[in-house]
Every structure is written in structure tokens, then in C-alpha cells.
Design a protein with these regions (language model features):
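A ligand-binding cleft/hinge motif common to bilobed small-molecule-binding domains
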Residues: 74-77, 91-99, 154-155, 181-216
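Extracytoplasmic small-molecule ligand-binding "clamshell" domains
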Residues: 23-91, 99, 245, 258
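A conserved helix-loop-strand patch within extracytoplasmic ligand-binding domains
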Residues: 63, 92, 99-154
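Periplasmic-binding protein-like
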Residues: 109-113, 195-236, 258-270
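Extended ligand-binding regions for polar small-molecule ligands
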Residues: 52-60, 119-127, 139-140, 147, ...
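Short helix-initiation/N-cap motifs at beta->coil->alpha
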Residues: 51-52, 67-77, 128-129, 162-177
Length: 270
């Protein structure tokens, strides 16, 4: 299988028109900076769990791939403007997003956790796992812009002092350097890129896993424009096959020392 890798910014793609379900090449939108999910290696190659999933889908439905790098807050508008055909970028399946685009079945879990300093003595949640809004008073709270985490914080902690970031990396750097007190992000990425490293030694998760379906949805899926039902069915079938044959677990084991697969899968085993 030949994979066409076009590492271009979404701003210069400039392609219009809907991609038919039988297309020989599918353009895949992703950030290209979100390791270990989707990123460029020093050699300029695309790598990460999302990339492996996209390749697995392409192999099973018989298409080539072209990668289009796109900043997160412009991901949905770029898809709707036909700058690419699929989003394979760790995007959570939420009701708000489903009003605009379609999603495949999930290919990994979607949740967040809050990080803070070990010596801060933070008790932000009660014994039932619910946040105590008053405990967040006076804390500078790092949140990624236009994310499901931002939606959750705005709804649950309306009085929080939010500091917005364009990605997890600058946010965690500010946490390390004391410019913010706590931060919420993907716990898989936080563990691999921060907590397991020397610079994250003084920090820990200060919340339980936060996975309320209302905000985080049932998991992460492939996004595509509405009206591509044939392509969506092919992608769902490819993902079901990858679940059944263990491919998704194999992909995730390359990057994570723990499972990132949902406990149940729509359509599998029915």
C-alpha cells in the first residue's frame, strides 16, 4: 500500500468540493503536533496512534492517504470547507459536534484529568468524585482552547480563573514553571509527556478520571462531513475489524503502557 504523505498547512490546501465515498485518496486532517497521537518525526514522517488508525482504515477500505496539518480550533471549519475529508485527530464524539458532522464508532476512550503540584495539598473533589467549586477559588486553571475540557470547566466551574492555551505542551510548561496552578488535559498524554519525565516529578493527578458523556462523549472517533454514508459505513466496518483482530490494541501498545480502548463497542459482537 502506497501512502501519499502531504504535510501541508490547511491554509494552503485550497481544495473544494465533497470527496465521494469511492475516492482513491482521502485527505486526513490532524494537528501534526499532538504526540503521541499524531505528530511529525524529526525525519518529517507522520507517526502516532491516530496515524496508525488512519493507515489501518486506509488499508481495509483500499484508499491512499494525504495528511493535512490543521490547528485544533480550526479543525471543524476546515472539514466543513472541504479542505480535507476526514478528521483523525483524537476528536471526542460529542452531541454538539454531531450537529455539524458525522462520526465513526469510537476507536479510543475520551476523558480528562487535572494535574497539580504534589506539595500543594489540593483536594478539589469530594469522595463521590464530584468537583467542589469553592476549592478551585484562587487557582489559575490551564485549559486547552476549544476543547471538551474547556466545555466541562465552563459548565462545572463557572467561577474558575481560566487561562487558555493553544495546546497541551505550552500549558504543561507553564504548570511546571508556576504560571498556572492546575491544568486539565488528556491523562495519557500527560503521563507520557510530563508525569513520567524528570520535569514532571513534582506533579500528580489531583482529580479522578473525568469522563462525563455529556461533555466527553462515548469516545474518540473519525469525523467526516454529513452525507457520506457509504464512506462512514466502510470506516465503521474497518474499525470493527481492527477491534476484533486486535489491531487497535496493537497500535496503542506502541505508545501507551495501559489500555486506551473503550470497554464496549457499538456493533461489535452483535
Amino acid at each position: 500500500m502506497k501512502f501519499m504523505i502531504g504535510l501541508m498547512s490547511a491554509a494552503i490546501v485550497g481544495l473544494a468540493g465533497a470527496m465521494p465515498a469511492h475516492a482513491e485518496t482521502l485527505r486526513v486532517g490532524m494537528e501534526c503536533t499532538y504526540a503521541p497521537f499524531n505528530y511529525r518525526t524529526p525525519e518529517g514522517e507522520m507517526a502516532g496512534y491516530d496515524v496508525d488508525v488512519a493507515k489501518g482504515i486506509a488499508e481495509r477500505i483500499g484508499v491512499d492517504l494525504e495528511y493535512v496539518c490543521q490547528e485544533w480550533d480550526g479543525m471543524l471549519p476546515a472539514l466543513l470547507a472541504s479542505k480535507f475529508d476526514l478528521i483523525v485527530a483524537s476528536m471526542s464524539i460529542t452531541e454538539e459536534r454531531k450537529q455539524k458532522i458525522d462520526f465513526s464508532i469510537p476507536y479510543r476512550v475520551s476523558l480528562g484529568r487535572i494535574l497539580g503540584a504534589k506539595d500543594a495539598g489540593l483536594k478539589l473533589f469530594d469522595d463521590a468524585g464530584k468537583p467542589n467549586p469553592e476549592a478551585f477559588n484562587g487557582l489559575r486553571f490551564g485549559v486547552e482552547r476549544a476543547s471538551t475540557y474547556a466545555k466541562w470547566v465552563e459548565a462545572k466551574l463557572p467561577g474558575a480563573e481560566i487561562v487558555l492555551y493553544d495546546g497541551a505542551q505550552p500549558m504543561l510548561l507553564d504548570l511546571q514553571n508556576g504560571r498556572i496552578d492546575i491544568a486539565i488535559t488528556n491523562p495519557m498524554k500527560a503521563y507520557l509527556d510530563f508525569l513520567s519525565k524528570e520535569n514532571g516529578a513534582g506533579f500528580e493527578f489531583v482529580s479522578p478520571p473525568i469522563d462525563e458523556v455529556e461533555y466527553f462523549g462515548p469516545g474518540v472517533g473519525v469525523g467526516l462531513r454529513k452525507g457520506n454514508d457509504e464512506l462512514l459505513a466502510k470506516i465503521d466496518k474497518a474499525l470493527e475489524d481492527m477491534i476484533k483482530d486486535g489491531s487497535l490494541e496493537k497500535y496503542s501498545s506502541k505508545y501507551f503502557p495501559f489500555s486506551i480502548q473503550p470497554s464496549g463497542w457499538k456493533g461489535v459482537g452483535e
